[in-house]
């Protein structure tokens, strides 16, 4: 019974440590005048962005309006229930919001966060350019961790809000994803 208690206590300590790490990214604002931002894809409903993707896109739009030299890499392939790629959906949304097509690069093969970051590298000098990653707030810490593991040198997170009542669910799920990532070989 003592071993069970020790294991449970260790598990709780690890869980709270991971949640603390995730919490460090919840309000990440990035820095001004980044060379690139990578907007991580998220579910598309038909041809329209999901609520989570719309939050990411609104954050990207605001950043790009405030930083007119920044280029966006829109990263996301086409899921099974999606009529178009996530990248194409993002392009349409941002163009409609007034962002010039010349500032938008589409990466349309990725289906995971790791692939988003790996496949987006080809569009920039990821070891020297200053790069921001836009994703929902609960996902920022792990995304930046993955970027650094993928060789990005000058990278920061930019948190899109998550106003969903499911935020606590996402935070718990992200803790398990982060634990899995920390066990994954680089």
Predicted features by range, described:
Residues 1-21:
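Transmembrane alpha-helices and immediately adjacent membrane-cytoplasm interface residues
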């Amino acid at each position: 019974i003592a071993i069970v208690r020790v294991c449970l206590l260790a598990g709780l300590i690890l869980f709270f440590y991971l949640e603390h790490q995730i919490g460090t990214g919840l309000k990440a604002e990035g820095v001004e005048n980044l060379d690139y931002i990578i907007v991580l894809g998220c579910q598309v409903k038909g041809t329209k962005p999901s609520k989570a993707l719309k939050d990411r896109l609104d954050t990207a739009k605001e950043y790009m309006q405030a930083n007119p030299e920044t280029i966006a890499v829109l990263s996301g392939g086409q899921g099974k229930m999606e009529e178009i790629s996530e990248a194409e959906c993002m392009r349409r949304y941002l163009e409609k919001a007034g962002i010039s097509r010349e500032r938008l690069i589409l990466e349309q093969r990725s289906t995971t966060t790791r692939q988003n970051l790996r496949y987006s590298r080809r569009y920039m000098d990821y070891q020297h350019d200053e790069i921001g990653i836009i994703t929902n707030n609960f996902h920022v810490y792990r995304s930046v961790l993955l970027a650094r593991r993928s060789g990005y040198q000058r990278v920061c997170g930019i948190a899109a809000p998550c106003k969903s009542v499911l935020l606590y669910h996402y935070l718990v799920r992200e803790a398990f994803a982060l634990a899995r990532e920390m066990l994954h070989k680089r």
